[in-house]
Amino acid sequence: MFDIGWSELLVIGVVALVVVGPKDLPEMFRTLGRVTAKARNMAREFQRAMEAAADETGVKDVVKDVKNVTSPRSMGLDAMKQAADRFEKWDPMKPQQGAPKPAAPASSIPAAKAQQGAGAAAVTAPPASEPAAPVPQAPAAAAPEAASPAPAEPKSNA
């Protein structure tokens, strides 16, 4: 605390011996020890009182909250650092080991489940990504006419 070396202590002891005298020197050191002990006790008691007052006012809770708010994890800096590390290690020419397989279109999944649930083992519906070609339906009465060939259009010379 005071940063006093052995040489300084020896000088203080010699001066005290000359000034106080050999008869009263032990009593003076006892008194000095008691005063030092009382000063330490007072400092310890003051520190405990300050800590108790801080506990009552909630300073420790505020300090804990401030540390949590300013921590790198809560700010997302840890996640950013991990992402940057993964990006630095990433080789675009190397295929990914855990690459997900392309998923089936969402509209074809319910159609397949509906067919399984109905027990239909006949025709499966085409996926939604490929639209089905429209099939023209002719009325039953017009069916014989549709079978005859259509007249050829005359070519015009323009």
From Swiss-Prot:
GO terms under biological process: protein transport by the Tat complex
Feature: compositional bias, Low complexity: 94-132, 138-158
Bilayer disposition of the protein: Single-pass membrane protein
Subunit field text: The Tat system comprises two distinct complexes: a TatABC complex, containing multiple copies of TatA, TatB and TatC subunits, and a separate TatA complex, containing only TatA subunits. Substrates initially bind to the TatABC complex, which probably triggers association of the separate TatA complex to form the active translocon.
GO molecular function ontology, one term from the record: protein transmembrane transporter activity
TM ranges: 1-21
Extent of Basic and acidic residues compositional bias: 83-92
Function: Part of the twin-arginine translocation (Tat) system that transports large folded proteins containing a characteristic twin-arginine motif in their signal peptide across membranes. Together with TatC, TatB is part of a receptor directly interacting with Tat signal peptides. TatB may form an oligomeric binding site that transiently accommodates folded Tat precursor proteins before their translocation.
Name used for this protein in its record: Sec-independent protein translocase protein TatB
GO cellular component: TAT protein transport complex
Annotated region (Disordered), positions in chain: 73-158
Keyword flag Disulfide bond: no
Major localization listed first in the record, in broad terms: membrane
Gene transcribed to yield this protein: tatB
HAMAP family found in the cross-reference section: TatB
Family membership noted in the UniProt record: Belongs to the TatB family.
Keywords: Cell inner membrane, Cell membrane, Membrane, Protein transport, Translocation, Transmembrane, Transmembrane helix, Transport
